[in-house]
């Protein structure tokens, strides 16, 4: 199975996200994976050093909250992205980063959850996702 990762490659534009799904199909993908989070559910708006991205990255000096706020896929896009993927014959699924994301994805009948590498120690999230869906990829 070939999975195309959407991540933040839409650059904040819904049209780009939709075209990315269609391009994934043209490129031979079988599925497209989103990331489902909001900045306010995965970090704090805080100016302490632990909340600033380290030197040496392209986001050097940026606050995590601000980066996540720019990079996330707006939740109001998810339904349309799932629909476009289905029209294209693709499986659409996501990495939920918290329980509220799982709940939103449940409403879209998301067929699988991919637990992000960064979240593999978040046992409450994994247990919650597993209580909703039997197919989870870690």
Explain the meaning of each model-derived region.
Residues 19-35:
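Catalytic domains of carbohydrate-active enzymes, especially glycoside hydrolases
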Residues 31-70:
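Glycine-rich, proline-tolerant flexible connector loops at the mouths of alpha/beta enzymes
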Residues 136-138:
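Conserved small/polar residues in nucleotide/adenosyl-binding loops
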Residues 5, 24, 105:
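Conserved, mostly hydrophobic/aromatic
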Residues 7-9, 37-39, 97-99, 118:
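Active-site beta-loop-alpha junctions enriched in small/polar residues
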Residues 11-23, 75-76:
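Glycine-rich anion/phosphate-binding loops
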Residues 58-123:
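Active-site beta->alpha loop and helix N-cap motifs at the rims of alpha/beta catalytic domains
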């Amino acid at each position: 199975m070939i999975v195309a990762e959407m991540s933040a490659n839409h650059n904040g534009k819904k049209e780009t996200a939709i075209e990315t799904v269609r391009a994934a199909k043209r490129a031979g993908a079988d599925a497209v994976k989103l990331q489902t989070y909001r900045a306010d559910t995965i970090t704090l708006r805080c100016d302490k050093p632990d909340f600033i991205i380290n030197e040496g990255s392209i986001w050097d000096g940026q606050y995590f909250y601000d980066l996540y706020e720019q990079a996330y896929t707006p939740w109001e896009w998810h339904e349309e992205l799932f629909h476009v993927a289905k029209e294209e014959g693709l499986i659409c699924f996501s990495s939920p980063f918290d329980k509220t994301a799982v709940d939103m994805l449940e409403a879209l009948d998301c067929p699988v959850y991919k637990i992000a590498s960064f979240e593999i120690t978040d046992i409450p999230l994994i247990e919650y996702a597993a209580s909703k869906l039997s197919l989870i990829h870690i």
